Amino acid sequence: MKALERVYVIGHKNPDTDSVCSAIGYAHFKNNVEKGKTFIPARSGDLTNESLFVLKYFGMNPPLHIETLEPTVEDLELKNPIFVTPDTSAYDVAMLMESRGIKNVPVVSKEKMIGVVTESNIARVYVRRLKIEPLVIHPVPFDQLVRILKAEVVCDYMKEKTVSGKVHIAVDALHVLLGKIEIGDVVIVGDNEPAQIALLEKGAKLMIVVNNAPVSNRVLEIAKEKNAAVLRVKFDAFSAAKLINLSLPVTLVMSKKFPTVTKKDTLEEVKEIVFTSKIRAAFVEDEKGRLCGVITRTDLLKDVRKKVILVDHNEITQAPEGVEKAEILEIIDHHRLGGLSTLNPVFFYNEPVGSTSTIVAEFFLKNGVKMEREIAGILLSGIVSDTLFFKLSTTTEKDRKMANFLADVAKLDLEKFAKKLLKEGMKIPEDVDPAELLKRDVKVYEMGEESFAVSQIMTSDFSTLLKEKERFMNTLKTLKGEFGVKHFFVLFTNPVEEASLLMMDGDQKLVEKAFNAEKKDGLFLLKGVMSRKKDFVPKIGEVLRRER
């Protein structure tokens, strides 16, 4: 049965709670209304303490962590690999290659790949062995040799169940051949009763009679006496020798060096491996090192892209890495238009509300999709977080009504839950790394030829941050270079005081003109600035457009 097509529902880089919750909610909604696909909530970055609290509170698994939206090995439709075990004969591998039309066969032992047999492996070993005199047969099960030779078992008095030793073809004078025979060897002989008898008496353990030649009762008596076996085949001695050559186990034929990849490797990386490999293939191993697929050049010629739905953003600078190589199916957002382009027309829903989770919840209601308590709680969390429990200026009446509705479905006291959630979100550990803190919730904006980044950190106490001001300022210089922007702003927002302290590395005149604010002790106090999206970015953008 063909696996369902996967579609990843994913928020912006460094996801906040609304980004995480709307991805979970919308994936759940789509799985209910659109069959034939599986919608997977995903994220690009680490989870915040607030998001972890929400997931634990409602018993939900974290969204799948995706490092890049570039196509990876797991986006290919990998078939179950055809493989053999170490005791398989080279003959059987050759037959498998011919019947399945494949050029490389993995050798697997205890679920781990230990080698690969290629067409050239078989040809090279076969040609090399033809130059060796006498031929040697490696330990091979008697029944397997019978099958490979398509032989008739005339008699079998051998005590051993495996055959090994030198192989002699009766083409020399009999006295010469008898001088070479050792006890336990294999002989190939034609319609020559004296030779058959003499070879068995000398100690041949297995005699292969070619061209369907007759075997007398006298020969059978000696075979019994010597604990030997006699096989009869319909073809000539040379053909029998060729097949015996191919009876050796694949462990003596296979290459022990072979290219491997994982499901997380990008197809660009895999192409480099496959196209530079002698066998023009790579073998896929899972996280436990078990073989789970084979990739050939043909697989890499297909146009493979991850299918994604973007939520809570529509700007290329905020999108997960590799989004330009993905196929965007939908965009669900509540921010300004960011100029993200797509190859094909997409469903784009953008509404000026306080949270993407509000929009997702509305989809449930409009389409009559039942909402479980956990999903209602998840979406409620997204609204409470992104509106700071309705304190941000981006909050709309629709956000308030939807939050109250979701609280009823989730059977929660809205005010108590909101305070608990925001308290978790505003916790800042004393030993936190400044760079890690400032990158938790940062967004990059481009306006004309200028770009700037805005990080926002919620706090209930400005005094703690003031103590670490110098450490944060030093970190800002590094982050500005890391993000490749001209200005880096950090908003420390206090919902209780309904104000933000602004720390920055860049042109401070932008802030002075945008907010008519003065810098004090290296910081700007911006009263009433609560929302990055509505209170801060538009005013900075207005100054840039006016003066640049």
Swiss-Prot record:
Its cofactor is Mn(2+). Belongs to the PPase class C family. Mn(2+) 1 binds at residues 12, 16, 312. This is Probable manganese-dependent inorganic pyrophosphatase. Residues 1-74 are annotated as: PPase part 1. The keyword Manganese applies. Mn(2+) 2 binds at residues 18, 312, 334, 386. InterPro entries: CBS_dom, CBS_dom_sf, DDH_dom, DHH_sf, DHHA2, DHHA2_dom_sf, DRTGG, Ser_kin/Pase_Hpr-like_N_sf. The lineage of its organism: Bacteria, Thermotogati, Thermotogota, Thermotogae, Thermotogales. It is found in: Cytoplasm. It is an enzyme of class 3 (hydrolase). The keyword Repeat applies. It comes from the Bacteria. It comes from Thermotoga maritima (strain ATCC 43589 / DSM 3109 / JCM 10099 / NBRC 100826 / MSB8).
